[in-house]
Amino acid sequence: MDVEKKLFLKALKEKFEEDPKEKYTKFYIFGGWRQSARKREFVEFAQKLIEKRGGIPFYNPDIGVPLGQRKLMTYKISGTDAFVEGDDLHFCNNAAIQQLVDDIKRTVIVGMDTAHAVLEKRLGVEVTPETINEYMETINHALPGGAVVQEHMVEVHPGLVWDCYAKIFTGNDELADEIDKRFLIDINKEFPEEQAEQIKKYIGNRTYQVSRVPTIVVRCCDGGTVSRWSAMQIGMSFITAYKLCAGEAAIADFSYAAKHADVIQMGMILPARRARGPNEPGGVPFGIFADIIQTSRVSDDPAQVTLEVIGAAATFYDQVWLGSYMSGGVGFTQYASATYTDDILDDFVYYGMDYVEKKYGLCGVKPSMEVVKDIATEVTLYGLEQYDEYPALLEDHFGGSQRAGVTAAAAGCSVAFATGNSNAGINGWYLSQILHKEYHSRLGFYGYDLQDQCGAANSLSIRSDEGLLHECRGPNYPNYAMNVGHQPEYAGIAQAPHAARGDAFCLNPIIKVAFADDNLIFDFKWPRKCIAKGALREFEPAGERDLIIPAA
């Protein structure tokens, strides 16, 4: 690739204010932690709060290893022009990352056909577009916490739950035309024509409700609460809209359908050692996460679609799931942000896609080990050569496992672009890790590559303990639950073949449609831009409590 075309050079020059190829730099001249405006702000706030804390010591950057011996880097959010401080990418400091997680956790999808069948066949009540519209108006009152069946019921302040609503979608164009547009996710409107036809073919005449439970609920409770909150209000709304008796036996069928039989969760329940209910990050399969991200509706660039999935997944899986649920603390942000900052992964992925297009064409070759070896080797060596040639790039990705993850992600995605096959893609990742280890004798921290050493052996069989198609694997897949710097890239490798083929969805068309919704708080079409807004403090989240606390 021509030097002037390398995507990461602009960021490196801005960050370090020196030639990215310079082999020597300076230390101890930057003013320590004071070079960072954000850390100066942290210290100022901490000093004010010590008295409020009764004198208990608080944030003090002079404790521990001296900060700021080197340049405290800013980070360019890849695919944008925004440069931000690293601290503002920690999920606690970034309202957009928090909302990304909340919007997934607070979503549940419920099939409406069972409930409609109970109404018509068991109770003799006619279901029409008019009654569906009346029900949807009722559920949009009840779901945020409004009472419909009994009086003397306490209700929730609308100002706290303004983000809560329900919508409906169907693959039946005639029914969709009759639904009040305020409630409809219109497949024909939201998707390009070819994608819309593909999705409607899969969904058919079935009808689904999407419930967005209030953000404040998943802040106080957990993802497992969401289907219950939704089901309770669905039951009350059916009783009201169809004028049913609250105590009759058929109501149990509504409850069962809304809580269990027709429920589609975003994430599966986790085992006891991880102890999380449904709709928590650790239970979201990679293919489902790829479908949650909506870039494929608005871009036909396979690399861009894939990179947006990886960027969002880095915050979701590495920063929040592994970095907080499973670990806690501050260190995981640096691992995760390597995949969505400074256009480094973008450069490697576009290099790989260009190589594929020239030699094979997108989806132009059947998967084979020879193809995996060729593409993964080419892209891996390109990435490693950049780290050799540009010391500033090495400083940017200062951890070996950052470099391994980024290089292997580009290799795996490139193989997937060529073959249209996620299994080939994940083997491209595994091979890249092995090549990288041959090149440098090690990758990152001890055990980083543990899962990669055994990956190829169990990716070519479908077994209950080690198998699964790649799109169906997730953070709790046995060998994938171990280490940071893998799961976001795996989500990208799940997306890459479908992006290359121009598929409307990756794993589940119902999930894809559910998030094709402009009323969501987080922008799932352009996650990296949204994360940048969060870092720049320009993002307005939901779930705030200003209405019920003293004015500042």
Curated annotation (Swiss-Prot):
Pathway the protein acts in: One-carbon metabolism; methyl-coenzyme M reduction; methane from methyl-coenzyme M: step 1/1
Keyword RNA-binding among UniProt keywords: no
Binding site for coenzyme F430: Q150
Top-rank taxon: Archaea
Binding site for coenzyme B: R228, K259, H260, R273
Keywords from the named record: Metal-binding, Methanogenesis, Methylation, Nickel, Transferase
Gene3D superfamilies: 3.30.70.470, Methyl-coenzyme M reductase, alpha/beta subunit, C-terminal, Methyl-coenzyme M Reductase, Chain A, domain 1
A Pfam family per the record: MCR_alpha
Cofactor or coenzyme needed: coenzyme F430
UniProt binding sites for coenzyme M: Y335, Y446
Catalyzed reactions per annotation: coenzyme B + methyl-coenzyme M = methane + coenzyme M-coenzyme B heterodisulfide
Similarity remark: Belongs to the methyl-coenzyme M reductase alpha subunit family.
The protein's role, per its UniProt record: Component of the methyl-coenzyme M reductase (MCR) I that catalyzes the reductive cleavage of methyl-coenzyme M (CoM-S-CH3 or 2-(methylthio)ethanesulfonate) using coenzyme B (CoB or 7-mercaptoheptanoylthreonine phosphate) as reductant which results in the production of methane and the mixed heterodisulfide of CoB and CoM (CoM-S-S-CoB). This is the final step in methanogenesis.
Protein's UniProt name: Methyl-coenzyme M reductase II subunit alpha
Encoding gene, per UniProt annotation: mrtA
